[in-house]
Amino acid sequence: VNVLKTPLVSVVIPTYNHGHFLGRALQSVLDQTYTNWEAIVIDNHSTDNTDEIVQSFTDPRISLLKINNNGVIAASRNAGIVAAKGVWIAFLDSDDWWISDKLYECLKNQNDKVDFFYHDLKLIRESSSFFQMRIKKSRQLNKPILIDLLVGGNIISNSSVIVRKSLLEKINGIDESNDMIGCEDYNTWLRLAQITDAFYYVPKTLGYYLFHRSGISRKDMSVAMKYAITSFIPLLNCRQKNKVESLLKYTKARHAFLECNYSEIRQELLFCMAYASLSIKCKSIYMFISVFLKSKYGASH
């Protein structure tokens, strides 16, 4: 691959007892057509075969760091950022993986006016007997990026991001507070958007995101999301605040709905139907009707 400028990219991969996934993630980095990279695996002292998996890759560009992160994945990512020697940091979760052109397809667009790349991912839903696939689609954010990210919600997947290390240093890395677990990435994008609008969307599916039942994806994210966005709310006007509030309420309602806890979600959904963006309004109406039918006909699932 003939890329005129090929600065070093540091791939930061936090992991904990994901030996059964980690090999796939590392192989996808090894397969990159853009070859000037280093991969830093930050392991929270796993008790599985993580060490053997990393050691099976003899490429000197792959290194292993051990830390105690006390259940806070942000601490692992921060350790990787500190250790990174690259101009660019690329985040990759250990259960996700990239297509071989991912780094090239992003970095061929690099110039002084781009600070942050992101793209679409294929979502692989792990189910008892099969995988279902759909696209985790993103879009080009409108300027000011910060406002669009707040009002539209987090449309940026962690394993799609490549960002300048210097900017992560400028915002003092990722927030490690317990309250924000699961939404620390969203908070990071918001804080980066405070200092740069140079977010570049690559409209291609360049990797895979694994959604599995044991993951953070199953938790009620509305509380962590509130922590992630609270300090930015004063920047919004009244209409924008209502949209953000409806996002929080929809997130809470959706979790309750998936857990079949229908009693408390009607008020949340009514608010969403009044104030949310069109897509959330439609989802809320659908959910509201589903709840109504389930309670009317006594179906518990």
Put a short name on every predicted segment.
Residues 1-30:
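N-proximal low-complexity "stem/linker" segments adjacent to membrane-targeting elements
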Residues 20-23, 48-56, 97, 101:
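Acidic helix N-cap motif at the loop->helix transition within catalytic regions
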Residues 28, 35, 43-52, 69, ...:
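A conserved acidic beta->alpha catalytic loop
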Residues 67-84, 105:
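Glycine-rich, basic loop-to-helix element that forms the pyrophosphate-binding segment
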Residues 89:
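Short aromatic/hydrophobic "clamp" motif used to bind/position activated sugar donors
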Residues 101-132:
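Conserved donor NDP-sugar-binding/catalytic core segment of glycosyltransferases
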Residues 140-220:
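Conserved nucleotide-sugar donor-binding catalytic segment
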Residues 205-213, 217-243, 264-274:
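Catalytic core of nucleotide-sugar-dependent glycosyltransferases
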